[in-house]
Amino acid sequence: KKLVDRHSNTNLALNLHPKQLQHPSTWTFLDNISSMRGNVSIELTEHCCEFDPADGADALQTYISNMKSKGFSLAIDDIGSGQNNFELISKNVQNIHTIKISLLDFRNTNEDSMFFSLNNWLNFSNRYNLKMVVEGVESECISNKLKNLGMVYQQGYYHGKGQVLC
């Protein structure tokens, strides 16, 4: 709370491992910070996770829906890695706000294929009114090419390193 108060114009992203969603303490924490939900978005990391069978086959979808119902903006991080794939996005499109795609996943791909794939994700995000962030932007050249294609939300060392706020 103190951090958000000191940096009231700053939005914070809280990364959650899917396994954390099984713990009641996570939900208590989210309840405790719910008054700050306008400044806090939740990023669901790509880590694969086995959910307790008692939670049901659609446990992750239920958790995602619960975060949305608490008023949090939800981002799916590192699309194409781990469990964060098209199937997860398409099943939860009504409950997510942002998709994040890392250029690191395209290291061994030619640039044309990379931009083709990114363009498909951009079309998908536009269709469903999702914000799309391209992560791993490390040069002005790539940044400008992305902007020219309409990919204006970018993250990476080209734009600056992370900052300590405390």
Model feature map: region roles:
Residues K1-Q61, F72, G136:
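Catalytic core of bacterial c-di-GMP phosphodiesterases, primarily the EAL and HD-GYP domains
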Residues P18-Q20, E43-P53, F72-S73, D77-C166:
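EAL-family c-di-GMP phosphodiesterase catalytic domain
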Residues F29-S34, Y63-S65, I89-K91, W121:
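Leucine-rich repeat
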